[in-house]
């Protein structure tokens, strides 16, 4: 996927705007800020942004046996 195609998606633009206002964020925090985006879609779009090196994981929190990633714009 080309960079222009990645960043022109409306959902990914909203996620990107979230990170312009907040230095870091978890999926849970982003879901709270963007409640109209379904959770599965949010996870998929964050994965696309992370795989394309637009977002990076800056920390990981262990919560009840699972790992919650903290993301930041690269």
Model-predicted segments: where are they?
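Short, hydrophobic-biased segments on the C-terminal half of alpha helices
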Residues: 46-47
